[in-house]
From Swiss-Prot:
GO MF assignments: ATP binding; dTMP kinase activity
Keyword annotations from UniProtKB, A to Z: ATP-binding, Kinase, Nucleotide biosynthesis, Nucleotide-binding, Transferase
Protein name: Probable thymidylate kinase
GO annotation, biological process: dTDP biosynthetic process; dTTP biosynthetic process; dUDP biosynthetic process
Highest taxon in the source lineage: Archaea
Family listed: Belongs to the thymidylate kinase family.
Length: 196
């Protein structure tokens, strides 16, 4: 089973991912994230810090990192029968790069999805950490181009479109709650999913 954690910056998904890693010890589970720690992921991280990075080039950096992640980590773990829990995955690309490419290409989120469809492995379930963009930006510190509240509003709208298209896959977590409440909701949801 592939479970992904999604939400705008500052929503608490990385904190929940760390807590899940600590608390889910009953069975072998692969915990991973995107961007990865590969050289592809390093290129993505450099791009995040570059306010002038070309948005289309940036999309393909993220896509290369995702392809490597699939072949190196996700598919081998799933083939070995291990559940995978990923902090960010393809939906982040659809939501974030869909917002970044707005005004650059027509129907950007649909374009990004079409780029991924031939090779990606869709998640079985996704925890969506829902928080208002102003709260997310404040929590994240708005230290890069992807953490500004107005940009995060566009990203959140894209996430809502994804949820509307696949409501059965998404499990919404109210990330305006305390950190401990968010973590508990995430742990409970993942434990339920893994027990199916």
């Amino acid at each position: 089973m592939l479970i992904t954690l999604e939400g705008i910056d500052g929503s608490g998904k990385s904190t929940a991912h760390a807590a899940l890693r600590e608390r889910l010890t009953a069975e072998e589970t692969t915990f991973t994230r995107e961007p990865t720690d590969s050289w592809y992921g390093s290129a993505v991280e450099r791009s995040i810090g570059d306010a002038d990075a070309d948005p289309l080039a940036e999309l393909f950096l993220y896509t290369a990192d995702h392809a490597d992640h699939l072949s190196r980590v996700v598919r081998p773990a799933l083939e070995a029968g291990e559940p995978v829990v990923s902090d960010r995955y393809s939906d982040s690309r659809y939501a974030y790069q869909g917002a970044t490419l707005e005004g650059v290409i027509d129907e950007p989120m649909a374009y990004v999805k079409r780029v991924h469809e031939p090779f990606t492995r869709p998640p079985d379930a996704t925890l969506y950490f829902d928080v208002p963009p102003t709260v997310g930006a404040e929590r994240a510190g708005a230290t890069n181009k992807f953490e500004a509240a107005d940009y995060l509003e566009s990203v959140r709208e894209n996430y809502e479109r994804l949820i509307e298209a696949e409501p059965e896959r998404f499990h919404r977590i109210d990330a305006t709650q305390s950190e401990s409440a968010v973590v508990e909701a995430a742990v409970e949801t993942v434990e339920t999913l893994l027990s199916r």
